[in-house]
């Protein structure tokens, strides 16, 4: 065989062998599509933008909608950077875009599309909605948009919101975000500004939050340009996640021979400290720690610089004359006097009241011109003048104390060299850095001169041990490493065990007075002295029988025997003479007595305050920017002011009496009204119920349209000819620019006195003064400015509104047969009867129970108590401890005696049973408010009756509804002190009659003794 033939045979043999080897491998991969190594994997990415255009976004900046415009600039910059490309030379990335914007409604402005021009055109056309915030519904709609796409692409959503919500009708943000993640959608959370609710953003973002939240913002801090870094980081994360999901190696790979063993590498440098983990769930409350040792006395402070003598102040203006005091109610009926002798014939009675005016007569002839009249009385003080000129700048203050060291900021750009500053104090020692890697050995330097001795460094405080972070995700299993070199010396160990006790410290401050509990039995005393002689002993036993004595004398006659039975009835006797007249009988009830009894029974004859023919309309802001708590304060303000105006017209269509209406508004089409002529509003209680039923709308702010609505629906349709019309408008002065600002003066020039109250909103934005003055018909003196909504319910401001709306009240008393003079109460005080209902159940605990009754004693000591039971001012207090349905203990009834209160509290015993608040309320009404004997009212009729509940609300529900109705019938003003974190808010709201402002929440019973809480409680009660 030739050599050429042998080579051909060898090549044919190798080819046959290769085919035999590859056929099984090809059969193994027949079920999967094979991609050659040169092809690129398609990786389509869909990005959906979810934009919050609610009022909480629109009103954060001035002008309104500027923040929404920045968002509309951010997204085009984002879209411009999304280019189709081959990523990592492995996958071919293509992009699709879609989006929606939302408030309390959702509008899809663009479905998913590949055209950038089409998407951006639709984006520029959107306008902010400016209403409530329902983020959960927006995420739900976004998820549905992705579900309608059949393509198996990588899905991302960019949610731009501040994290605040006004409602969750679609199940909540957290649930909808988890549902989206289950569908394979990854959500990025981007903040439009710095005013955000971070926890809400973290609920939206997919885990890990370091990747999908990572402090993404539309604009950098304290800047107006778009944050390019945020865009680049999000796009980089999208590409990386898409690559990991799309790229799958399908080429045939044959493992090569193992390479030679590598050299041992250098020891790596110590890694940087990881970022702190997310805060863990709130743990249970720990046990109280042991009392620490008394600290060493601190160093004496440096004496401060003496201030300069101030300038002599100018003489103050003479104050305006005080307002007339309010007439008090009649005193209670005195004891029945003795019957007096008949009086002499009385003098002729006083002239009776003038009759009703007759019909108007015919117009008479013009009379002669009269003489010039006397000069009129001086008029009322005018409104306060405009503010004076701005004063000269004040003297610079003393330099302040050095503040604590701030956190290390980002490295700034190199600025121009500044002037040489004064030498600063020695800096605080920095944190210990990680150990660096060994550097290259340098050349030996020349010995330098000996330096001066350095200043001793300040000893730093030991830092507190940080919270344990959450465990990170499990990493991939690493290869088995080779044995390492001997490690460097470790850091110092943890703190050693506690040392021995130090020397005794200085004598501590005098402790608080202790509780008067009986102490342990004392030691046995010394032997006493000899006692007094004991009492005479008992009779001894009989002695022996004596000898027989002599016969005695005859005894005295015995007692007569018993009386015999009566005999038979005798015949009737003759008629006797006529008797003398008997004494005169008691006089019957007079008309005075009857009317007094009726007055004491039903209170229908009391004097009442009348403000004349008066129509008052309140226009209150119910938009999202106000907030739920502030809206509740607005309603309380309306109720408190109307309560000061006395009775309201029983017939809304009558020409006399006061009528009240309310308009609450948000965005267009959401206005709600309590009309002036509503037939259901015929008493103060019915008006209060109608106001309490108003619900927070939480939408946009269309103030001009609301004012026009108020005039058309409340004033124009039901106006009375002789009635004075007042309007009180509560707003921050800002409104939606889409509204017609010409309607700001809708109430002007129509014989309506408009008073405007301007208050900042929940974003701490100041009120708009120019708008407020326009609403008040360009009368600045009728504009009241406040910083907080809580100032609305302050007693001083309520007094001011009362004088403004009803400057000349008329006190009308019924014409009774016997009238008494009115007892005028002090203006600075008012009568109040307070009944404390203290929960004595086992949930409270004995220690907390004693803290609670000590709080009651402190309240009694702080309040000005009445001088007697019929005192027309000041306070009386009662206390009821309750447990189960049949366990109620009246510790002390309504009393003004502080000694009686202290003695009763010293003897109180903890029930330690279950809890039933309904039975306790009924028992308090039947045994404290009313007399248990005859059912007469013990609480003073002219006093406010206040129930103070000290409970957590976790109680039995039996008789609760009946008890609430009984409270309403007795006109009880409830106050709830809820202590601890585990409370039943539904029960607390029922006890507070739906008024959240009447519920005081504190973390524990120790807070009862804190001055801040105690002062708030006293101001609320009084």
Curated annotation (Swiss-Prot):
Residues 306-318, 363-377 have a biased composition (Basic and acidic residues). Residues 534-543 have a biased composition (Gly residues). Residues 1-27 form the signal peptide. PROSITE patterns: VWFA. Residues 44-168, 613-738, 833-957 form the VWFA domain. Belongs to the type VI collagen family. This is Collagen alpha-2(VI) chain. It comes from Gallus gallus.
